[in-house]
């Protein structure tokens, strides 16, 4: 009887020890691998959910509006950031867009507290010089919006939200109009990225969504010196927010 109890006791201790070792390995050694595995599983669920969703519906509401950039304010922004010199050698709208996007991309991502008070390109840049922690994707998009508009490049700030209403994480990017290609394309100054198909054609948000649904190739390109290491994780992230 004593031998049986002793055996049971040793077995329980061994199981507890193995559990502790397993937890420590997951926590300190294989933490990134486990997190990526869990994210991949969740990411595949996002893709399946997106595949069951409806297509974008055309809006029947006709709203007359005009992208306004007062000449004096636009010149102030161009002079402050020296945009005319930056894009003078650009031979198309897309090249100019990427040159300007690097300004916003130079500010790193964070959700600061306190947040900026004034949301215009110049004040956001001044704020970033005093706060090394940076700001979030929405603020990046607002800054890029004003920078592009000041040189006459039409663009929109687009909020991309998940279907899960309890998920408070969304992503905000810019949709830029390229007159040479007669289309809108996505630019993400927060993650320093834009998307193309296998032939290098620039993609809009709607085209990205369609390609994820159809499981077709999307390439996530970096427009800065930083490389995009886990494109598959970025793919899953977009599946969640489209």
List PLM regions with ranges.
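Membrane-interface motif at the C-terminal end of an N-terminal transmembrane signal
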Residues: 18-39
């Amino acid at each position: 009887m004593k031998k049986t109890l002793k055996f049971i006791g040793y077995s329980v201790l061994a199981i507890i020890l193995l559990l502790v070792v397993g937890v420590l390995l997951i926590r300190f050694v294989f933490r990134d691998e486990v997190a990526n595995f869990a994210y991949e599983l969740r990411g595949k669920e996002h893709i399946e959910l997106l595949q069951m969703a409806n297509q974008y519906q055309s809006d029947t509401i006709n709203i007359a509006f005009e992208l306004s950039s007062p000449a004096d304010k636009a010149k102030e922004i161009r002079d402050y950031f020296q945009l005319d010199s930056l894009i003078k050698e650009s031979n198309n709208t897309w090249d100019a867009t990427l040159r300007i996007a690097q300004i916003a991309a130079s500010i790193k991502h964070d959700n600061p507290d306190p947040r900026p008070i004034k949301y215009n390109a110049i004040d956001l840049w001044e704020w970033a010089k005093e706060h090394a922690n940076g700001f979030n994707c929405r603020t990046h998009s607002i800054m890029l919006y004003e920078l592009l508009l000041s040189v006459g490049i039409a663009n929109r700030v687009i909020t991309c939200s998940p279907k899960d209403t309890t998920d408070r994480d969304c992503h905000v990017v810019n949709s830029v109009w390229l007159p040479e290609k007669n289309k809108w394309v996505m630019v993400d100054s927060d993650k320093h990225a834009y998307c193309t198909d296998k032939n290098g054609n620039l993609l809009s948000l709607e085209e990205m969504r369609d390609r994820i649904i159809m499981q077709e190739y999307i390439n996530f390109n970096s427009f800065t010196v930083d490389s995009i290491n886990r494109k598959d994780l970025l793919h899953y992230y977009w599946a969640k927010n489209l």
